[in-house]
UniProtKB/Swiss-Prot annotation:
Chain positions of cross-link Glycyl lysine isopeptide (Lys-Gly) (interchain with G-Cter in SUMO2): 106, 195, 254
Residue ranges, annotated region (Disordered): 185-271
Domain of life: Eukaryota
Family: Belongs to the Abd-B homeobox family.
Entry GO CC: nucleus
Origin species: Pongo pygmaeus (Bornean orangutan)
Name of protein: Homeobox protein Hox-C10
Primary residence: nucleus
Database matches in PANTHER family: HOMEOBOX PROTEIN ABDOMINAL-B (PTHR45874), HOMEOBOX PROTEIN HOX-C10 (PTHR45874:SF2)
């Protein structure tokens, strides 16, 4: 080994800030420097990468101080080729050869520690080192994070920044977002149409009376004029088609539901009134005398009030069920009134 050109023995005295003169450690954690008095020559230009040493008494051997880690050991790429095995190679010692540099070569401040972005921040440490290495060595020895090395020696310095620098990186997401826009417009278009169109069928139902309502109005007018004629008409319709009244009632219920049942808020089905007041009074009188009718008595009543035998029979059945229900409710009411629930 030969000493570098024109280096005074105590050129690194400013960097050693510890009180003892034999202190061999710089302020930075990753630098180890040996004093020039140990090797009978000036301070060596090569400074090796080594982990920070905590003890002051444990001094390194001259061979360790004179050697540096190889230039191809740098940080392993996180975005490198997945086929490359992530392994940590053992550092191999290599002596630093002395070389002369032309005056045109620009020399930097720090030998092998930080990248260009980090070197810009370390301006105050420029006066601590007299003859640093050129930029070619800086790129090879760059180790931003300790204990991570690159697997292959062919890669150059990590000059690329991890930030995205260009609009090409974002073209695919923007295209995907643009493809979603027509779908949202397609979904919004039927909603606008639904707000404008309203059904107008209830108006036609409410304005134009149904033929069933016309029939009922005519029958009521006839009942006012001559009750006997209305009874005859009802008897004829009941004899001819007993199911027509059911169909008419269902149609009336549908008409009420369409015309705005939400205004009246009626609950339950519409009650049918197939019997007139005169007919119901006659049937109630007979029910008071006898709850169960014989076939002969039933035929007599049906002839007097212009009803069929079947209609009278059904009316008495319904009346008995109604009476039974009323008796049950009255009985429950009487039982509950005797007990005082507190």
């Amino acid at each position: 080994m030969t000493c570098p050109r024109n280096v005074t023995p105590n050129s690194y005295s400013e960097x050693l800030a510890a009180p003892g003169g034999e202190e061999r450690y710089s302020r930075s954690a990753g630098m180890y420097m040996x004093x020039g008095s140990d090797f009978x020559c000036g301070v060596m230009r090569g400074c090796g990468l080594a982990p920070s040493l905590s003890k002051r008494x444990x001094g390194g051997s001259p061979s360790l101080a004179l050697n540096t880690y190889p230039s191809y050991l740098s940080q392993l790429d996180s975005w490198g080729d997945p086929k490359a095995a992530y392994r940590l190679e053992q550092p191999v010692g290599r002596p630093l050869s002395s070389c002369s540099y032309p005056p045109s070569v620009k020399e930097e401040n720090v030998c092998c520690m930080y990248s260009a972005e980090k070197r810009a921040k370390s301006g105050p440490e420029a006066a601590l080192y007299s003859h640093p290495l050129p930029e070619s060595c800086l790129g090879e020895h760059e180790v931003p994070v300790p204990s991570y090395y690159r697997a292959s020696p062919n890669y150059s310095a990590l000059d690329k920044t991890p930030h995205c620098s260009g609009a090409n990186d974002f073209e695919a997401p923007f295209e995907q977002r643009a493809s979603l826009n027509p779908r949202t417009e397609h979904l919004e278009s039927p909603q606008l149409g639904g707000k404008v169109s309203f059904p107008e069928t209830p108006k036609s139902d409410s304005q134009t009376p149904s033929p069933n309502e016309i029939k009922t109005e005519q029958s009521l007018a006839g009942a006012k004029g001559s009750p006997s004629e209305s009874e005859k008409e009802r008897a004829k319709t009941a004899d001819s088609s007993p199911d027509t009244s059911d169909n008419e009632a269902k149609e009336e219920i549908k008409a009420e539901n369409t015309t705005g049942n939400w205004l009246t808020a009626k609950s339950g089905r519409k009650k049918r009134c197939p019997y007139t007041k005169h007919q119901t009074l006659e049937l109630e009188k007979e029910f008071l005398f006898n709850m169960y009718l014989t076939r002969e008595r039933r035929l007599e009543i049906s002839k007097t009030i212009n009803l069929t035998d079947r209609q009278v029979k059904i009316w008495f059945q319904n009346r008995r069920m109604k009476l039974k229900k009323m008796n049950r409710e009255n009985r429950i009411r009487e039982l509950t009134s005797n007990f005082n629930f507190t």
